[in-house]
Amino acid sequence: VANPTAVDGAFADALAAWGRLDTLFNNAGIGSFSTTIDEIPVQTWLDVVSINLTGSFLCARAAFKIMREQSPKGGRIINNGSISAHAPRPGSIPYTSTKHAITGLTKSLSLDGRPFDICASQIDIGNALTDMAQAMTTGMPQPDGSIRPEATMDVTHVASSVLHMANLPLDANVQFMTVMAPKMPFIGRG
């Protein structure tokens, strides 16, 4: 997703196959956790920014172009934010920074998309049990320095939430949604 040529090619293929684009779920992402800023290799920072932010920008840009030009115009771009954008984890500077930036991308897309019937929204997901989140069940660093297991939820709850957002008509939008395991640390995390 961080290669502009590959992204543009994928969207061109989708347009050729289906004739239009109604929804983009910007869902690619990687994490880098467990160290302080002075120990983060610059390449790690660049890798996380490249996938999480540049990749989301490139996909949104390609989708926006198609949605703006198709007839009837319009569509929906749903960005995968994160609870970490609002309540960071210890040692998560690259990941958290990109997720803050996704919120800015979402707000700007919402504003720029209005004249073209393009809705933008964001889902902030917390502790959905995927391969990326498996470590949460055995223990994650907490703000007090301890390592504790965290509650997780079935990833199908995320899927049904995204489908709800995607299925709305273009005269309605869920601007921001948070879906999370209710017993995970979030409110009062730090």
Question: Could you describe each region identified by the protein language model?
Answer:
Residues 38, 87-93, 150-151:
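Active-site loop immediately N-terminal to the catalytic Tyr-X3-Lys motif
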Residues 82:
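Residue(s) in the substrate-gating loop at a strand-loop-helix junction
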Residues 122-123, 142-188:
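C-terminal helical subdomain
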Residues 60, 98:
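Active-site helix of classical SDR
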Residues 65, 111-114:
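Alpha-helical segment proximal to the catalytic Tyr-Lys
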Residues 1-10, 42:
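The beta1-alpha1 cofactor-binding region of Rossmann-like NAD(H)/NADP(H)-dependent oxidoreductases
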Residues 35-37, 44-49:
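Substrate-binding pocket helix/loop in short-chain dehydrogenase/reductase
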